[in-house]
Structures are given as C-alpha cells and as structure tokens.
A protein has these predicted regions:
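Short, compositionally biased
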Residues: 169-186, 190
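Small-aliphatic-rich amphipathic alpha-helix that forms the alpha element of a beta-alpha
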Residues: 57-83, 100-111, 202-206, 226-230
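Helix N-cap motif at beta-to-alpha junctions
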Residues: 275-281
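Active-site-proximal betaalpha loop/short-helix elements
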Residues: 90-93, 192-267
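Glycine-rich anion-binding loops of enzyme active sites
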Residues: 40-48, 53, 78-176, 294
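Beta-strand->loop->alpha-helix junctions that form or flank phosphate-binding loops
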Residues: 28-31, 219-220, 238-247, 265-267, ...
Length: 326
C-alpha cells in the first residue's frame, strides 16, 4: 500500500505498535491518540513524548520546543527535560543557520524552565530541508494525570485558542499572498505562531485551576477534526461538535476560502481540546474557553452539527496544509 504524506492510517499504525515489549512500570504505552507515554516512578509519573518538525523552514528551533511542551502539558504534567535531534540538510549547512536553531531552542527552553540534556546533530544529504525532533519529559502527581482515553458520555467538550493558527502562520510564511492580503494582514498571519501563539501550557494551567479534565488533546496534524477523532477512538466514545461554536480568526477563515481548504483539518497547535464533567463546567473561568460540543455514546458516531444539520465530522489523515504546500 502506497502511503500518503501525513499521519499513518490509524489501522496500520495500530498494527505497527502492537507487540512491543512493555515494562511493568509503563502505565500508558503506544497507541492511537496517545501522544505521550506514562511511566510509574513511585510517587509521581514520568511523562515522555517525541515530536518532529517537518512543515516549517523558519524558526524551527522554537517550534521544536513548543510542540513537545504541548504534548506534555495535555497530560497535566509540567515539562522539565528534553533531548534534541537536528538533521541538517546540505542546503542549510551553514553555521549561522544552525546557530539560530540552537539559540531559539535555548531561549524557548529557558523561558519555560526546561533543561536540554542531550541529543544528536549531523549534516546529511538524505533530506531536502532541515528536520528537528525532540524528546521531552515531565512529571505529574499521580492523581493529577489526565489521560487521553478518559472522556465519558455526557462530558462537555471545550476549546481554548483558535482553529488553524499554526497552519495559517506557516502558509503565510511559505507562500506569496500579496495578491489577496494587505501587507499588514500577511505580517499578522506570519506572527500567529507568537501571537496568539502555539504553546498551550498557560491554557492547561488555567483549566487545571478549576477542574481536572477527563481528557485533553492538542490538535496538530489534521487539525481540530482529527484531534476529536483521536479522542473519540482513544476513549471509545462518540462526539457531537457544533461547527458554529468553533473559534477561528477572520484571517484564517479568509485564507481558507481563497486557498480552498477546510480549516478544521489545518494544523492547529496553540489550541486546546478538552472534555470536562458537565457538573464542573460552570466553575471554569479561563479567558478564551468555549463550549463546542459534548461526548456521546460510541454508537452515535463522531458528528458535526452545522446550520442545524448533523453530518459526519470529516477526517484528515493528511493535514490540509500538505495540499497547499505540495
């Protein structure tokens, strides 16, 4: 079977991760929708995640730290340590370019109190553009761990942040949009990765002040829609999402119409999807929290309510950005 760019098909991935030897201390191992492993180390859990940066050619050091922070944060853990791998293309084999990557990693890690403890670097002719990847580790008290398979029917689905922020920023920096947007609009979109930003640690911290979510997910490749499908699969439930309640920036909406893509399937680091018990929703006071749906029985499927009509929530095994930047 010829594979397309993007995430592997879930059924194939499930087969690939089956059969690994799992140590007794592993509480959560590899699985669909599980971005982090959880290891029992006694009084706490050690949470471990790995994520590469493949879509971005600028500021990849910042992105590398950011996306791994997010994977740790959605478990309820605080990020603490990371290792870094930098595979440098021959085109980028320049000391100034490499120094910028490391400076961005250093500054971002320092800002969030993360120690970079090792890694690997090399120049390789095997890739067209530089690829970075990190493994990040964090710690969480056992009773505060948030599992991605914890959603239950009746839970409320909430969202913080905006759909497609990361993808909008990448597109604005990779394509010439001057024929459709003003200079000010283009610069605004380019800066989306900083403002409103793609790191969700503060959003998670706010949510945790008021409740312990039953599940959390940071929508990366495949966007909001794919994140919902992954939560549904992990928790063995259905979801009903209200389209009109999903927050999106007007510039992302305009961009989606001009380039003909669905922003629900656009890479969306910077947003947070969580499920919380219905009885706890009213006490949550976080600045940009929106209620966007509810968790249903598995038999109900994963649905989208749009203009009063219920339809299947689309899947995006390949992020919408892949067809734009192809």
């Amino acid at each position: 079977m010829k594979l397309k760019p993007g995430k592997l098909p879930p059924d194939l991935l499930q087969k690939l991760v089956e059969g690994f030897v799992i140590h007794d201390s592993v509480s959560i191992g590899p699985g669909i929708g599980f971005d982090s492993a959880v290891i029992d180390i006694g009084k706490e859990y050690l949470v471990v995640t790995s994520d590469p940066i493949t879509f971005v050619t600028e500021d990849i050091g910042y992105y590398t730290v950011a996306v791994n922070i997010n994977d740790i944060a959605v478990t309820g853990a605080e990020p603490s340590f990371m290792t870094l791998t930098v595979l440098i293309s021959q085109e980028d084999a320049d000391s100034e370019k490499v120094s910028k990557i490391f400076n961005d990693v250093r500054n971002t890690a320092r800002e969030y109190g993360i120690s970079v403890i090792g890694g690997h670097t090399e120049v390789t002719p095997s890739i067209e553009s530089t690829i970075t990847s990190a493994t990040m580790m964090g710690f969480v008290e056992k009773h505060k761990l948030v599992r991605q398979d914890g959603a239950k029917p009746g839970d409320v689905v909430v969202m913080m942040g905006l759909a497609g922020v990361e993808g909008t920023s990448i597109i604005a920096r990779e394509l010439d949009l001057s024929g459709s947007f003003s200079t000010e609009e283009i610069e605004r979109m380019k800066n989306f990765y900083r403002d409103p930003g793609i790191i969700i640690l503060d959003k998670v911290r706010c949510l945790k002040k008021f409740t312990t979510p039953t599940s959390m997910h940071d929508p990366t490749e495949g966007g909001i829609a794919q994140a919902i499908h992954e939560l549904a699969r992990a928790s063995n439930t259905g979801f009903l999402i209200e389209f009109e309640k999903i927050p999106v920036h007007p510039l992302t909406l305009k961009l989606s119409k001009i380039l003909d893509f669905n922003y629900l399937g656009l890479i969306s680091s910077g947003s947070l999807i969580a499920t919380v018990k219905e009885s706890e929703v009213s006490r949550i006071s976080c600045p940009d929290l929106k209620i966007i749906g509810k968790v249903t029985e598995k038999s109900s499927g994963v649905k989208l309510l749009r203009q009063g009509r219920v339809e299947d929530l689309p899947r995006f095994p390949q992020d919408e950005i892949t067809k734009i930047l192809a």
